[in-house]
Regions:
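PLP-dependent class I/II
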Residues: 1-187
Length: 187
């Protein structure tokens, strides 16, 4: 909800988990709202999910290096208590402006690899050699461009946030990361 800065309501999330629940997906920073959960919120989520050992957790961290206002990304990889059921997805497309190159990666526990393979065979094809070489160069190269892009995205975020909130009957939550704005035009 906008009034909660689009943060996960942990109490509600836990109340919805039942014997059929197999996976919880966390997208941080969030698409489409741009909301960002800081470490304290992630700590609470992990603590609440420890009670459900049969529920896998998928952490979509594709925007992990596009965090505004000097905050740090609390990757779920830093929580040993859930590592045996944690899936982390990330990639090059957002950080290195390689959208469309379809180059990403995932970290899966060995117990979930067979399930991942069943999904992957129907979901995607191999990344081209050009994409793979470009990805290697992006990682090896200077990260100054990433900082420059982040600064530009933050300036754009500020501009769109202020502009939308200056409009009559429009409000907009201030995104904490990614490159999305989620204006409320329902007034």
């Amino acid at each position: 909800k906008e009034e909660d800065s689009f943060q996960i309501n942990i109490k509600k999330m836990v109340s919805l988990i039942n014997k059929k629940t197999r996976l919880i997906i966390i997208n941080n920073p969030n698409n489409p709202t741009g909301s960002f959960m800081q470490k304290e919120k992630i700590d609470e989520i992990v603590k609440s999910l420890i009670k459900f050992p049969n529920v896998a957790i998928l952490s979509d961290e594709i925007y992990s290096r596009l965090i505004f206002d000097n905050h740090e990304m609390p990757s779920l990889l830093k929580y040993p208590a859930i590592r045996n059921r944690l899936i982390v997805l990330d990639g090059w497309s957002k950080t290195y402006c390689m959208t469309g190159w379809r180059l990403g990666w995932g970290i899966w526990p060995s117990t979930l690899i067979n399930h991942a393979n069943k999904l992957a065979v129907n979901d995607h094809s191999c990344a081209s050699a050009v994409s793979q070489i470009a990805g290697i160069e992006a990682l090896r190269g200077s990260q100054k461009a990433v900082k420059k892009i982040l600064k530009e995205f933050q300036e754009r975020r500020n501009l769109i946030f202020e502009g939308l909130n200056s409009l009559k009957n429009v409000s907009c939550f201030k995104p904490g990361g990614a490159f999305y704005a989620f204006p409320n035009v329902s007034k």
